[in-house]
């Protein structure tokens, strides 16, 4: 099937449910600043590429990329780009609702719900994405062959886009919403509702 275009999936989600970044209390985090060099006739020309994450720690998160000749404009562009790509993710009591894999190129990530008190067990660039999303308990692992921050962040967003809320699952399966929610609460370590 090839690589899924994460930007296209995010744009599609934004068209369905537009999110205004101005009303959210967003925090920003720079994941990576990379210096690139272009050799010209008169010498080398440096530029900087930045990957940034924004989120409100309440179910909204976005990522962006920025390039400029200096670091501060590169960061500003990355943050502005991230604010254009904010998505809403369904969380259950501070964790993800169910196990999910995300892929981008050779980066593969696994997100699993965790019981309350576990914390964010995630490494590399996955950690700031999950923290700014508002996840307090999760087990996450980079399963693929690459640890390239750009690919890992995109794979994490692919996984987040695949998450289904209890309401969506109940609708698809034709079950009662409360039954699905009680199962999700048990899975996430909360108190089951009877």
From Swiss-Prot:
The N-terminal domain interacts with the head of the 30S subunit; the C-terminal domain interacts with the body and contacts protein S4. The interaction surface between S4 and S5 is involved in control of translational fidelity. Signal peptide: none annotated. NCBIfam families: rpsE_bact (TIGR01021). With S4 and S12 plays an important role in translational accuracy. Belongs to the universal ribosomal protein uS5 family. The lineage of its organism: Bacteria, Pseudomonadati, Aquificota, Aquificia, Aquificales. It comes from the Bacteria. GO terms for molecular function: rRNA binding; structural constituent of ribosome. Pfam families: Ribosomal_S5, Ribosomal_S5_C. Part of the 30S ribosomal subunit. Contacts proteins S4 and S8. Keywords: Ribonucleoprotein, Ribosomal protein, RNA-binding, rRNA-binding. SUPFAM superfamilies: dsRNA-binding domain-like, Ribosomal protein S5 domain 2-like. InterPro entries: Ribosomal_Su5_D2-typ_SF, Ribosomal_uS5, Ribosomal_uS5_bac-type, Ribosomal_uS5_C, Ribosomal_uS5_N, Ribosomal_uS5_N_CS, Ribsml_uS5_D2-typ_fold_subgr. This is Small ribosomal subunit protein uS5. Residues 26-89 form the S5 DRBM domain. The gene is rpsE. GO terms for biological process: translation. GO terms for cellular component: small ribosomal subunit.
């Amino acid at each position: 099937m090839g690589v899924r275009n994460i930007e296209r999936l995010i744009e599609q989600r934004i068209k369905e449910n537009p999110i205004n970044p101005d009303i959210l209390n967003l925090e920003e985090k720079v994941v990576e600043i990379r210096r690139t060099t272009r050799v010209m006739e008169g010498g080398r020309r440096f530029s900087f590429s930045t990957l940034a994450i924004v989120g409100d720690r309440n179910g909204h998160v976005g990522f962006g990329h920025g390039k400029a000749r200096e670091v501060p404009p590169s960061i500003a562009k990355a943050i502005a780009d991230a604010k254009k790509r904010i998505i809403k993710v369904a969380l259950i009591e501070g964790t993800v609702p169910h196990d999910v894999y995300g892929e981008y190129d050779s980066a593969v990530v696994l997100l699993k719900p965790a019981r309350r008190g576990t914390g964010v067990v995630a490494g590399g660039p996955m950690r700031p994405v999950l923290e700014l999303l508002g996840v307090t308990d999760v087990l996450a692992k980079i399963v693929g062959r690459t640890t390239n921050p750009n690919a890992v962040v995109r794979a994490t967003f692919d996984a987040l886009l695949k998450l289904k809320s209890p309401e969506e699952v109940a609708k698809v399966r034709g079950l009662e919403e409360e039954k699905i929610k009680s199962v999700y609460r048990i899975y996430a370590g909360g108190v089951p509702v009877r």
